[in-house]
Each structure stands twice: as structure tokens, then as C-alpha cells.
Swiss-Prot record:
PANTHER family: DIHYDROXY-ACID DEHYDRATASE DAD, DIHYDROXY-ACID DEHYDRATASE, MITOCHONDRIAL
Lineage: Bacteria, Pseudomonadati, Pseudomonadota, Gammaproteobacteria, Thiotrichales
HAMAP family in the cross-refs: IlvD
GO MF entries: 2 iron, 2 sulfur cluster binding; dihydroxy-acid dehydratase activity; magnesium ion binding
Protein name: Dihydroxy-acid dehydratase
Catalysed reactions listed for this entry: (2R)-2,3-dihydroxy-3-methylbutanoate = 3-methyl-2-oxobutanoate + H2O; (2R,3R)-2,3-dihydroxy-3-methylpentanoate = (S)-3-methyl-2-oxopentanoate + H2O
Free-text comment on the cofactor: Binds 1 [2Fe-2S] cluster per subunit. This cluster acts as a Lewis acid cofactor.
Family: Belongs to the IlvD/Edd family.
Residues that bind Mg(2+): D84, D126, K127, E448
InterPro entries linked to this entry: DHAD_IlvD/Edd (IPR050165), Dihydro-acid_dehy_C (IPR042096), DihydroxyA_deHydtase (IPR004404), DiOHA_6PGluconate_deHydtase_CS (IPR020558), ILV_EDD_C (IPR056740), ILV_EDD_N (IPR000581), IlvD/EDD_N (IPR037237)
Species this protein is from: Francisella tularensis subsp. mediasiatica (strain FSC147)
Residue sites binding [2Fe-2S] cluster per the record: C52, C125, C197
Length: 560
């Protein structure tokens, strides 16, 4: 008996009672034969106003052409996106994280309402990646991700630069390290065309995680946006989605607990973004896999950092592509027994089978260190707890800035206040900068603190101050930084009670973050604390404040 591949769409296309549905589909140009073909949603996060996304409509057309060669019907649709790089450092960065859940909601909505049989999702920027994955997990229909791809490095006076160079140029100019003319030249040359920010920032981190999970084709995460190989990846979309339909392989068959462990290992080895903690928690929630922040610490305890990527290192993702790409890294890890090779992937094969014929990394490469010569012996993403963060926090400690910091609190109730303090010289060596009321509810939307960390680095204070926040950090942030502090200030967490001059210890060896206050002093301060007014009174941010969970639960909006 022939397998039915259009088991969802036939509800509309073959049911006589759905004549109006069929009339509208005929009106789109479909013919009689099309009515019996499986319908594949091609969900692109295309928009013109961002280098990460500007080319995705073209990729979606390549995917549609490939899908239709396989006697399937490709149905392109779009969803929204937010450019973190553009909104960073402004009040409207509040819209970034909630766009992840809007992307998931909108893809789920279109796919479900139109009864599509499968999904090829094409994200390009930071929140696009987990948003598409959460939709795939919720729907649990055959599907996979084609990453829009990474940008090429910019070049200024013979040296490679990127988006973080542009962010740091302001602080460097303020401190006299570069001229205004050099700053202008930097921002004009940092982004040479289409593709996601080039270092191991959030988009590339999540692309690596998705490939390690088995939810994208091999090499997807490291293939540059404008390369021939990215077009070739799109050309494989049709045969890939048809194979998934024929084998009835669905996201929840692939996104297992072991697959998430593979993802956590790879992003640790790659030196990935702190945002991966939030996003993997949310993606796991979408497929009912039990994952917690403590699982990240378990992986960090036994997994080294090997990749010398920006922001703390030298290289960008396009450099890795040139020496074998992400699969070459995973092959090395598989040989070392660090990955589960038996995990199923969207090729229909296991991870080990996918990697079988992949070439090894060149012996003399300087991008990926050998296991016996790591950049850091344990993971850079450290989960810290203590009286400042009873429910946890996420630190990004590469080791270059040390692993213990003791200093005095310099407290700011917003990102803008802290930026003004740096500009006027009110941030000093030895400070533990505290930026609060920037959490999921308080921000709202848990804005990223890339502007503050870039100012610190640009001003030459990266080795001399620490920064803690209930907000997030961009994948481009580096230094001695601790984010995702829970409970957040808006809900009366300890970070709301900190005062200037408090002695704070951040210990990434013992995984603690404490303020030197007695329980009695903390109780006295707590009794005087009053909740602040919500920053949004209408619209999508108001809804987000009411529904979002804590950072330690992934900031999802659909928990009971």
C-alpha cells in the first residue's frame, strides 16, 4: 500500500466539504495534480533591513524550486524578525527576545491553520534560530532548518573586523585609542554583505546547536551566506523533506535528551553565547525534554573550550568553513567519545553515519585547538548560584579574564544609566557593575548588554571590572560577565536590594555569586523594597510581561 504523504493537507484538498478551501487554492494557481501533492511550508524570516536576513527570500525560492522538483508543493510564507545589532543599546531592544516566541507562534499558526505536511524553516538572525526550532518542536511534523549562513569578515586597512569591532569603536574613541575618522571607517566596513554576524555570536552558536541536534543538514552552520555551498544546501531541501515524509521522521524523534547533550557539548567546545542556555531550555520545552540550567553545568565541568572564535578570540565562522566546517569539529569530538553518535538526524541517518566520510581537521589549524591543548579546560558557560542569584545565573568566563573577581557594587537601574557613567568616567577599576530591572519582566524582554560590555572593552577596562545583570548578553559580549540573574529585580530578587559599595564575590571555580551581607541585613532591605511600575501598559510587551517565565526556565511564554 502506497504511503500517504499528504496526511495533513488532504484534509483541505481532498475533502469535498472543503470546496471553499479548494477554490482559494485553485485561485493561487494550483492545478488538479497539485491538489494531491504534499504541501511543504517554507517559512522564511526574510526582511530587507538586516544583513542576517536580507537574502533569505532568495534562499526560500531555491528551496521552493528544490521541493517542487520532488513532486511536492512548496508554500512560501514569511515571519517577523528583529535585528539585535540594530536595536542594541536602545529601549526597543526589549522587542528582541519576545520576537523568538512570536516567530514560534506565527510559524505554528500558519502551518496549523493551512494544514501543511512539512516545514523547511529558513532563519538568519539570533532569535530566528530558536523561534523556528520551537515551532518545529510544537508542530512535530517532518521538517528541518536551513540556516541563512554567516557573513564574511570585513576588512579595514588589511585587518579583519566584524560587528563587535563596530560596537567597541565608540568606547575606543571615547578613550582616545582611535580617532573619529577611524571609528567612521570601522562602522562602514564591518559588515560587507549578507549573512549573520561572523564570530561565535548567538546566531552561529544556535546554528551549531541545531546541527549538533541533527535538525539541519551537515555543514549548514558553517557555510557562508553568499557561498555556492549555501545554494547547494537549498537544492537538497526537496529530497531531504521528501525522505522525512516517507520515513515519517518528526522533530521529536530527533530532538531527544541525548541530542540536546550533543548540542551543549558542541556549543561549549565552540565557546558559544550565553543565550544558548535560554534558547536550548526553550527548545527542549517545546518537545517536552527535561532540561535545566544544572545540565549545562554538568556539561561545562567535563567539556573544554577549543575554538578560538571572536569575540574573545581571533576567528570568524567563515574561517572554520575553509578548514572543514562544523562537521570536522564534531568528527573530532565523536572520536573522543564526547558525542552520542547514535542520534537520528534529518538525513535519516545517525550523526555517526553523517560524519563517517567527513575529512579530519587539518593538523596545523589554529582555529580549533587539540583536546590536549584547550583554550580552557572546562566550559566557559558557568552556572553560578548564591545569595545574589538563588535560582541561578549564567556567567561567560573564558579564563582570559581570570575565574574569581571580588569588587564593590556600582549599581544602575538601567543600561542607559550605566552607559552615561562610563561616558563621564564614573566607572572605576575594581567595580562590580550592577545593571538591574532589565530582566524578562522588568526590561521587559531581557535586553542584551552588548553596548555596556563593548564600552567597557573599548575603554580598556575589560580586565578590571565585572558586570552582573538580570538582563542578557549578546554573543558578542566578553569580559567578566554574569547575566540571567534570577529572581530578577522586578520580582524582588536579591539584585534589586544591592547598594553601591556592597562587596560582591564572583567565583567561577566554586560556582558562587555572593554579596557580603548578613541574612538580617538582607531582610531589612527586603522589607523596604517596593515593586516598580511595569514599563509596558499595552501591546505585545504587556502580554510578554504577563506570560514570560524566568530566565532559569528559558523565558518561554506557554508554561502552565
Amino acid at each position: 500500500m502506497k504511503k500517504i504523504l499528504n496526511k495533513y493537507s488532504r484534509r483541505l484538498t481532498e475533502d469535498k466539504s472543503q470546496g471553499a478551501s479548494q477554490a482559494m487554492l485553485y485561485g493561487t494557481g494550483m492545478n488538479d495534480a497539485d491538489m494531491h501533492k504534499p504541501q511543504i511550508g517554507i517559512g522564511s524570516v526574510w526582511y530587507e533591513g538586516n544583513t542576517c536576513n536580507m537574502h533569505l527570500n532568495q534562499l526560500a525560492q531555491f528551496v521552493k524550486d528544490s521541493v517542487e522538483k520532488e513532486n511536492l508543493k512548496g508554500m512560501r510564507f514569511n515571519t517577523i524578525g528583529v535585528s539585535d545589532g540594530i536595536s542594541m543599546g536602545t529601549d526597543d531592544m526589549s522587542y528582541s527576545l519576545q520576537s523568538r516566541d512570536l516567530i514560534a507562534d506565527s510559524i505554528e499558526t500558519v502551518m496549523s491553520a493551512h494544514w501543511y505536511d512539512g516545514l523547511v524553516s529558513i532563519p538568519g538572525c539570533d532569535k530566528n534560530m530558536p523561534g523556528c526550532m520551537m515551532a518545529l518542536g510544537r508542530l512535530n511534523r517532518p521538517g528541518f532548518v536551513i540556516y541563512g549562513g554567516t557573513i564574511q569578515a570585513g576588512v579595514m586597512r588589511g585587518k579583519p573586523i566584524d560587528i563587535v569591532t563596530a560596537f567597541q569603536s565608540y568606547g575606543a574613541c571615547l578613550s582616545g585609542q582611535i580617532t573619529e575618522q577611524e571609528r567612521q571607517e570601522t562602522i562602514k566596513k564591518a559588515c560587507p554583505g549578507a549573512g549573520a554576524c561572523g564570530g561565535m555570536y548567538t546566531a552561529n552558536t544556535m546554528a551549531c546547536a541545531i546541527e549538533a541536534l541533527g535538525m539541519s543538514l551537515p555543514f549548514s552552520s558553517s557555510t557562508p551566506a553568499t557561498s555556492v555551498e549555501k545554494v547547494q544546501e537549498c537544492d537538497k531541501a526537496g529530497e531531504t523533506i521528501k525522505n522525512l515524509l516517507e520515513l515519517d521522521i518528526k522533530p521529536r524523534d530527533i530532538m531527544t535528551r541525548k541530542a540536546f547533550e550533543n548540542a551543549m557539548v558542541l556549543i561549549t567546545v565552540m565557546g558559544g553565547s550565553t543565550n544558548a542556555v535560554l534558547h536550548l531550555l526553550a527548545m527542549a520545552s517545546s518537545v517536552d525534554v527535561d532540561l535545566s540550567i544544572d545540565d549545562f553545568q554538568e556539561i561545562a565541568n567535563k567539556t573544554p573550550v577549543l575554538a578560538d572564535f571572536k569575540p574573545s578570540g581571533k576567528y570568524v565562522m567563515a574561517n572554520l568553513h575553509a578548514i572543514g566546517g562544523t562537521p570536522a569539529v564534531m568528527k573530532m569530538l565523536l572520536k573522543a567519545g564526547m558525542l552520542h553518535g547514535d542520534c537520528l538526524t534529518v538525513t535519516g541517518k545517525t550523526l555517526a553515519e553523517n560524519l563517517e566520510n567527513v575529512a579530519d581537521l587539518p593538523e596545523d589549524n589554529t582555529i580549533i585547538h587539540k583536546l590536549d591543548n584547550p583554550i580552557k579546560k572546562t566550559g566557559h558557560l558557568q552556572i553560578l548560584k548564591g545569595n545574589v542569584a538563588p535560582e541561578g545565573s549564567v556567567a561567560k568566563i573564558t579564563g582570559k579574564e581570570g575565574e574569581i573577581f571580588e569588587g564593590v557594587a556600582n549599581v544602575f537601574d538601567s543600561e542607559e544609566e550605566m552607559v552615561a557613567a562610563v561616558e563621564t568616567g564614573k566607572v572605576k577599576k575594581g567595580d562590580v557593575i550592577v545593571i538591574r530591572y532589565e530582566g524578562p519582566k522588568g526590561g521587559p524582554g531581557m535586553p542584551e548588554m552588548l553596548k555596556p560590555t563593548s564600552l567597557i572593552m573599548g575603554a580598556g577596562l575589560g580586565q578590571d571590572v565585572a558586570l552582573i545583570t538580570d538582563g542578557r548578553f549578546s554573543g558578542g559580549s566578553h569580559g567578566f560577565i554574569v547575566g540571567h540573574i534570577t529572581p530578577e529585580a522586578y520580582e524582588g530578587g536579591m539584585i534589586a536590594l544591592l547598594e553601591n559599595g556592597d562587596k560582591i564575590t564572583i567565583d567561577a571555580i566554586n560556582n558562587v555569586i555572593n554579596v557580603d551581607l548578613s541574612d538580617q541585613e538582607i531582610a531589612q532591605r527586603k522589607s523596604k523594597w517596593r515593586a516598580s511600575k511595569q514599563k509596558a501598559s499595552r501591546g505585545t510587551l504587556k502580554k510578554y510581561i504577563k506570560t514570560v517565565s524566568s530566565a532559569s526556565k528559558g523565558c518561554v511564554t506557554d508554561l502552565d
